[in-house]
Amino acid sequence: MKRAFIMVLDSFGIGATADADRFGDVGSDTLGHIAEACAKGEADNGRKGPLNLPNLTRLGLVKAHEGSTGKIAAGMDGNADVIGAYAWAHELSSGKDTPSGHWEIAGVPVLFDWGYFSDHENSFPQELLDKLVKRANLPGYLGNCHSSGTVILDQLGEEHMKTGKPIFYTSADSVFQIACHEETFGLDKLYELCEIAREELTEGGYNIGRVIARPFIGDKAGNFQRTGNRHDLAVEPPAPTVLQKLVDEKQGHVVSVGKIADIYANCGITKKVKATGLDALFDATLKEMKEAGDKTIVFTNFVDFDSSWGHRRDIAGYAAGLELFDRRLPELMELVGEDDILILTADHGCDPSWTGTDHTREHIPVLIYGPKVKPGSLGHRETFADIGQTLATYFGTSPMDYGKNML
């Protein structure tokens, strides 16, 4: 029975890539800087001491980081016995965003340039805004700028509740984000507005990767909270991913846990499971792994590393999240059967010690574990698509156009 379990620790980079200068990210290192802060006692909020990731270390994380950066992460064990295969991978795609990283993992790098709304104020074209107001029958809109998602709620949340005007904002990513109150505006109405925005962006040729619904609750600035009902409306990948090939060519199954289905615009997904928060995502993943049959991929995105801690530049939170994940990792490993493979990876970096709030251009870890996987270094990989090609070979689908089999 062949099954693959892919766990994306969203934003868990392990050191800047050779082309990081194009992005202003030279020296970024998500794992390294978290470990450094922990070793110095600067991340003792809600946790304590050096970064403690014994299970990820056994799978080769510290070795992969050393391969990427040339140094052992502060306070971590560079001499631990390694029971998995490990690599550090460079991104071929032109961006450092979520869809590019995930599509490339599935064998389809993004070699075109996304469209962006680069103006920090009055970010969106008036023609687009006018169409949204008219089609969705809106009383107007708020925002129309670059912002952090939590900051903009404190600034405009109360006015949104009073006026019913949705909050439109963007970032350095190729995104159009819409924040609305779940109760006063309504979740269904927000989703409908996002569908309209997706249509207008596509028809207008803006080439924007995602429209993101950002629902929130609360009654005043300071206590607004985003809920787990986020929804991403992505464009479809430009070519069949290994997920699609498994389903189409092998009548296989692909189970999405978390936001995976949204990222691939539901292409190649046969079952969707929603969960919010690290523990809930972990629990849902374990359940799906236990139920998975032959020719199945269970694919989970652990978004909190990025959304709650990376973008928020919360080093202690990120460290605590990693330690929680590591504590629970044996539960996953126990479910890996004789012919199965477990792949732990990331989609980009988001160094919580870095300036600004955006992603960072970094190598990602590729940690592969299974009874038939030979432990040791798989070295530097030139593209995340090596993961997709490895899966294509493993499941016996037609080969991907990019990437090399690692096993």
UniProtKB/Swiss-Prot annotation:
Known pathway: Carbohydrate degradation; 2-deoxy-D-ribose 1-phosphate degradation; D-glyceraldehyde 3-phosphate and acetaldehyde from 2-deoxy-alpha-D-ribose 1-phosphate: step 1/2
Cofactor: Mn(2+)
Compartment(s) where it occurs, according to its Swiss-Prot or TrEMBL record: Cytoplasm
The keyword Ribosomal protein is assigned to this record: no
Domain of life: Bacteria
GO biological process terms on file: 2-deoxyribose 1-phosphate catabolic process; 5-phosphoribose 1-diphosphate biosynthetic process; metabolic compound salvage; nucleotide metabolic process
Pfam families assigned: Metalloenzyme
Gene Ontology MF annotations: magnesium ion binding; manganese ion binding; phosphopentomutase activity
Cofactor note as given: Binds 2 manganese ions.
Binding site for Mn(2+) 2: D306, H311, H359
PANTHER family noted in UniProt: PHOSPHOPENTOMUTASE (PTHR21110:SF0)
Family note: Belongs to the phosphopentomutase family.
GO cellular component: cytosol
UniProtKB keywords: Cytoplasm, Isomerase, Manganese, Metal-binding
Catalytic activity of the protein: 2-deoxy-alpha-D-ribose 1-phosphate = 2-deoxy-D-ribose 5-phosphate; alpha-D-ribose 1-phosphate = D-ribose 5-phosphate
Species of provenance: Salmonella gallinarum (strain 287/91 / NCTC 13346)
E.C. number: 5.4.2.7
Protein purpose: Isomerase that catalyzes the conversion of deoxy-ribose 1-phosphate (dRib-1-P) and ribose 1-phosphate (Rib-1-P) to deoxy-ribose 5-phosphate (dRib-5-P) and ribose 5-phosphate (Rib-5-P), respectively.
Name of the protein in question: Phosphopentomutase
